[in-house]
Amino acid sequence: MTASVNSLDLAAIRADFPILKRIMRGGNPLAYLDSGATSQRPLQVLDAEREFLTASNGAVHRGAHQLMEEATDAYEQGRADIALFVGADTDELVFTKNATEALNLVSYVLGDSRFERAVGPGDVIVTTELEHHANLIPWQELARRTGATLRWYGVTDDGRIDLDSLYLDDRVKVVAFTHHSNVTGVLTPVSELVSRAHQSGALTVLDACQSVPHQPVDLHELGVDFAAFSGHKMLGPNGIGVLYGRRELLAQMPPFLTGGSMIETVTMEGATYAPAPQRFEAGTPMTSQVVGLAAAARYLGAIGMAAVEAHERELVAAAIEGLSGIDGVRILGPTSMRDRGSPVAFVVEGVHAHDVGQVLDDGGVAVRVGHHCALPLHRRFGLAATARASFAVYNTADEVDRLVAGVRRSRHFFGRA
């Protein structure tokens, strides 16, 4: 295991990520600018999972042997470490297989009549035009199942939520919105959205997938009722997501999935359920992934999320400046840094996003191309696809320069220069 990182020392940080040393096609070093899709993992995370699996692997919350006890302790300590990282209490975090499942858990339970705040016919569900499909389609389905109406905040021309586009009344039962757009990079006005929702008596659901890895997040301070984030976007393993729910709400909610581990008692006629969060963690949990995610939280915490945010803002500002200086390049989202972070999505006039991505890949620069699971947002701007560069703590200014140079090459290659 490498030495711990106590400040933003890029050389030390990058040494923790072996994949960043890769030489790609054409002999070019990897410039990984796709952390908004999935991040790379430091040795500390890999080592934590490996150590658990080779020394303490066992079934959690079952039996009385030493490995079970060690596995249970590691699992619950992981929950505590992650809760500390996001400003929540330990019993307010539910582990899921990803953030999409976490959002589906909430939307499913909100359609269950056993929950006193369930959505029904005539009610209104609100989301925004800015959302990832994972925070849109579950609400479409909830509206379909319950007879509720789905409405949404629109988006301004610079990619921000248009707060004047929708009025909330007492029919609104839930307001779901992103904290940090995975396309335009905007930071949404959480306090204002929460205030409006709560004034209408609605619950709030926050998609925090793009904020938790990149800036300080305190869920209690934000005042949301529910939030979801994923492990693989914050230097952690695949196969692990987190649902945050206020304690009093989780205590009232019926389960989403049923089976082993989440019960209190079972007879042939029925069952009673364990308290939250165990009530929502049916079956064998993803123990090693929790251990790895906790290691990722500790790793980022040791660097300091304020330092992470400041570093990434410098990279985003440099990318916006560099791309804005290229004729024919249009940035989707704000071109100022006010309430803005990573990613930077863009189009090159006359060149398809996939072709831009291929030219960049030929130079070792990895970006995402497509609609980034935000098709309605792209349609709002009349676009089928964009190229998207997204940054993480391990990226460098040199990699931004390579991005800009690669976009210039794409224009020359396709005769647009």
UniProtKB/Swiss-Prot annotation:
Record's keyword annotation contains Transferase: yes
Modification sites for N-acetylthreonine: 2
GO molecular function, one term: cysteine desulfurase activity
Needed cofactors: pyridoxal 5'-phosphate
GO CC list: plasma membrane
Gene Ontology terms: biological process: cysteine metabolic process
Domain of life: Bacteria
Residue ranges that the Swiss-Prot or TrEMBL entry lists as coiled coil: none
Positions where N6-(pyridoxal phosphate)lysine occurs in the chain: 233
Miscellaneous comment: Was identified as a high-confidence drug target.
Protein name: Probable cysteine desulfurase
Organism: Mycobacterium tuberculosis (strain ATCC 25618 / H37Rv)
